[in-house]
Amino acid sequence: MKVVTKETAMIAIQGPKAVGIVDSLSNGESSNIRRFRIGNATISGIPATLARTGYTGEDGFEIIVPADQGEKLWNTLRESGAIESGLGARDVLRLEAGLPLHGNDLSTETNPFEAGFGRFAYYEAPNSIAGAALRRISETENDRALVGLKMTGRGIPRSGLNIHEFDLGNSDEPNVIGRVTSGTYSPTVDGGIGMGYVDQKYSATGTKITIDVRGRFVEAQIVDMPFYKRI
């Protein structure tokens, strides 16, 4: 295996016009690449590997080209109507799409069942390194679950904030039942959204909760994800 990371550049183009832009620049070569598939195409004379993937909830491509062609590809996409965006925009989009981020919502301390990915855990393969552990976890009820959070009061559920049971007015500080792992303001749903882990018994859709936002217990609700679906 040869590592070619430093020999290549990758630019992601995402959004409702992304596929059309790439299709026009590749003379239709990209049109046969289906969602979650990889193919090759020439984009304005640049040999490229295209992955019909992304982390925004939008359709589009992640385009890999030789490193010395990265600037040319960037300029070509801009001249064709693409607009630059940074990680802040990407983070809002992936949250709206309900896509968890490793390092925030997933980690080496997370198991696939509490994160909602149990259906993808295969542990029947012979000599599987993690098979016994996954099987043991699958046979017990998890203490917590990853859920979608939607603010019904005014505030943003930022990463690290404590999630409390809904007990406004009955105690000075309601019981802590979890913690926010990702959160932002969503212009699409016009409000604060996020993800977090809560005790299993509070994980049902529709459960009312409060989130401690700088000392204020702001009302929120457990909701299904995605918050908004584009494709």
Give the location of each predicted region.
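Conserved, structured C-terminal
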Residues: M1-I231
